[in-house]
Amino acid sequence: MAQQAPDREKALELALAQIDKNFGKGSVMRLGEEVRQPIAVIPTGSIALDVALGIGGLPRGRVVEIYGPESSGKTTVALHAVANAQAAGGIAAFIDAEHALDPDYAQKLGVDTDALLVSQPDTGEQALEIADMLIRSGALDILVIDSVAALVPRAEIEGEMGDSHVGLQARLMSQALRKMTGALNNSGTTAIFINQLREKIGVMFGSPETTTGGKALKFYASVRMDVRRIETLKDGTDAVGNRTRVKVVKNKVSPPFKQAEFDILYGKGISREGSLIDMGVEHGFIRKSGSWFTYDGEQLGQGKENARNFLLQNVDVANEIEKKIKEKLGIGAQLTDDANDDALPAPVDF
C-alpha cells in the first residue's frame, strides 16, 4: 500500500539530506527554489544570426555544432565567436585537427592570436584529451575543435592504408562527449565542433547528406547550425565575398529552424555593418528608398556598399542601430563581466 503523504515527504527529505551529505550540497534541488537566470551567451558577430539563435548568441556551457559544405564560412563563424569571447576578457582555445588555421586571417577577424591557445594534435584521442583537460581547468570561455572529420583515431593512423576501422571515430566521439558535457556545464565553457558533410550511398528519398563522427554529437549538441554559401558578392567583376545562409536546425535554448543571412567578405569576415543594414531595413529603423539608405533623417549612402562604409566610419551610429534592434527583439546583452556575474551557464538537458 502506498505511503501517506507526510510519510513520503519525510522519506524524501531524509533521502535528500543523505544525498547532500554524500555528494555535496546542491546535488539535487527543486527547480523552483532559485530564480532562473538568463542564459549567458557569446555573440556570433552577426546580429541576424544572434536573433536566429533566439538568445543573442551561442549559449555558454553547451556543445555547439557548425557544419556545411567546404568554404561555406564554418571556421569564420567560429573565429568570430572566439574574437567576441576574447573581447569580453575571456580565454579561448582552438584545437586545429586539420592543421589549417591561418593566424593572419584570424587576426583580421579580431582574434587576439597572441593570447589564443592553439593545439595541433597528432591523433583524435590526443585532441579530445587536450580539450577535456582544458575544459576541466574551469578557466576556458570558448573552445573550438576544427574539425570532427580530422579527429583520426590512433588505430587508424598506426594501421595500414587499406585497413577497415568501422565505427572507431563514432565510438571515440561518443566517449569524449559523455565525459565533456558535465564539465562544460560546470565551467561555463562553450565547445564548438566544426563538422564536414558526407553523402550516404543509395539514398533514394530525402537528403543523402550526413555529418561525420557518428550520431553522438547530434544528440549532445544544444545548437546545430547548417552553414551554406548562397551567392557570390561582386564589386564590378571582382568577387569580394559570399552571401551566407545559416539555418539553426537544432536549438535546445530557443525555438529551432530559424534562418539568418549575412555577408562574409574575403579577408574581413562577417560584415557586422551589412547585417545591421539588413536587420535595420527589416525592422523599420533604416529606410530604403530606391538604392538610398536613410537612418533617422540622415543619408547613409547610395547602394549597400556605401551605406556599409558609412557605418564602418561612424561606429556610434552602428552601435545605436544595433541597440535599437536588440531592444525591439528582446535578445540578450553581450558577454560582459557584469553580464557574466548575473547570467549562468545554460543547464544541461538531453
UniProtKB/Swiss-Prot annotation:
Gene3D superfamilies: P-loop containing nucleotide triphosphate hydrolases. Can catalyze the hydrolysis of ATP in the presence of single-stranded DNA, the ATP-dependent uptake of single-stranded DNA by duplex DNA, and the ATP-dependent hybridization of homologous single-stranded DNAs. It interacts with LexA causing its activation and leading to its autocatalytic cleavage. PANTHER family: MITOCHONDRIAL DNA REPAIR PROTEIN RECA HOMOLOG-RELATED, RECA. ATP binds at G68, P69, E70, S71, S72, G73, K74, T75. Keywords: ATP-binding, Cytoplasm, DNA damage, DNA recombination, DNA repair, DNA-binding, Nucleotide-binding, SOS response. It comes from Mycolicibacterium vanbaalenii (strain DSM 7251 / JCM 13017 / BCRC 16820 / KCTC 9966 / NRRL B-24157 / PYR-1). Its main location: cytoplasm. The keyword DNA repair applies. It holds the Pfam family RecA. One of its GO terms (biological process) is SOS response. One of its GO terms (molecular function) is ATP-dependent DNA damage sensor activity. It is found in: Cytoplasm. Coiled coil: none annotated. It comes from the Bacteria. InterPro entries: AAA+_ATPase, DNA_recomb/repair_RecA, DNA_recomb/repair_RecA_CS, P-loop_NTPase, RecA-like_C, RecA-like_N, RecA_ATP-bd, RecA_C_sf. GO terms for cellular component: cytosol. This is Protein RecA.
